[in-house]
Design a protein with these regions (language model features):
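Extended, charged catalytic domains and RNA/DNA-binding interfaces, predominantly
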Residues: 4-320, 324
Length: 324
């Protein structure tokens, strides 16, 4: 079965799981909601459905893998946030091989990213290696790269080592804006306002996302400061860029264009082929100008991390060296 068919099956499973687990008038459901009792709420849902849906994701990735031709990774999104509304702390978690845990670690288990890293350490000891990479730190309201732990404790060398062991890379640009820098953080950089999304994701009305602690240049400075203070550098990470479209489709051809979950690519206006309406201008399109980066020739190092990222259409061109 192709990836798209498997994902359709997975999406239908999730729809049935979340929308119709029980009647909305079920007293046990309302007791869980009104008392904010997570343990009671979890008893309501069918965990077998949850596990089978995750198994479909794992099998879809492994079935589509063609060594040397098409590389797939098993992965999911850890969609956590702080207790403050819309402070995004999302991470993508990607597994190194075809081995995956029976179920992923989610915000249902904990909203603390440090608990995610400890879980990753634990399954790594069992032979299941993975990395997590934060994305949309620009919408974290300054919480992604804090100078303290999730619960406000001082940073430490142990914290820095734990974070860097599990989060050696950050997604600095994607469809919901760049997380490189911000005009308030880099006032002398004329490019600092490139594809900035000021609001926290999903906030209605839009709530301003505080820049300091949410952008990678600022994080690099904070990491150096932490190291200078003797508490290690928790922000010595590489960079990538992505689309965050959630559709597994690359924007390779205009006549087969995929973008953010079908909501911003359904017609020429939404794709930006014609002027965009005022209400859609806060959506950063998954496209852009062409730029080139020249790589030094040499062997590809497995596990190497780049220091740049790009969203939208990107390609790698290789030219053989001219004979001397």
């Amino acid at each position: 079965m192709c990836i798209r068919d498997r994902l359709n099956t997975f999406a239908q499973t999730l729809q049935n799981f979340f929308l119709n687990p029980r009647s909305y008038f079920d007293p046990e459901l309302w007791q869980a909601v009104l008392t904010n009792n997570l343990a009671r709420g979890l008893k309501i849902y069918d965990h077998d459905v949850h596990l089978s849906a995750w198994a479909d994701v794992v099998n879809a990735a492994n079935d589509a893998y063609e060594p040397g031709n098409f590389t797939t990774f098993i992965g999911y999104e850890f969609t956590t946030s702080t207790d403050v509304a819309n402070e995004n702390l999302h991470r993508n978690v990607m597994f190194k091989s075809s081995n995956a845990p029976k179920r992923p670690y989610t915000r249902i288990d904990s909203i603390n990213p440090e608990d995610l890293w400890n879980w990753m350490d634990k399954i790594r000891e069992q032979g299941i290696d993975s990395i997590a990479f934060p994305h949309n730190s620009n919408g974290s309201n300054g919480q992604m790269f804090e100078m303290e732990t999730f619960f406000g404790e001082p940073l430490s060398k142990e914290y820095a080592a734990l974070r860097m062991r599990n989060e050696p890379i950050v997604e600095m640009t994607q469809v919901k804006g760049t997380s490189d820098t911000h005009p308030l953080l880099s006032p002398n950089d004329e490019w600092a306002d490139f594809e900035i999304m000021e609001a926290r994701i999903g906030s209605i009305p839009p709530a301003f996302s505080f820049p300091a602690g949410g952008y990678v240049r600022d994080a690099y400075i904070r990491g150096l400061m932490s190291n200078q203070f003797g508490t290690g550098n928790p922000y010595k990470f590489g960079l990538i860029g992505a689309s965050d479209t959630h559709v597994l489709g690359a924007g390779l051809r205009e006549d087969n264009y995929w973008s953010k979950i079908g909501l911003v690519d359904a017609d020429p206006r939404a794709r930006g082929s014609i002027p965009v309406s005022e209400e859609d201008r806060n959506i950063v399109p998954n496209r852009g100008g062409v730029s080139f980066k020249e790589f030094e020739q040499g062997d590809y190092v497995i596990g190497g991390l780049e220091n740049w990222g790009a969203s939208g259409l990107a390609c790698l061109l290789y030219t053989s060296p001219s004979p001397r």
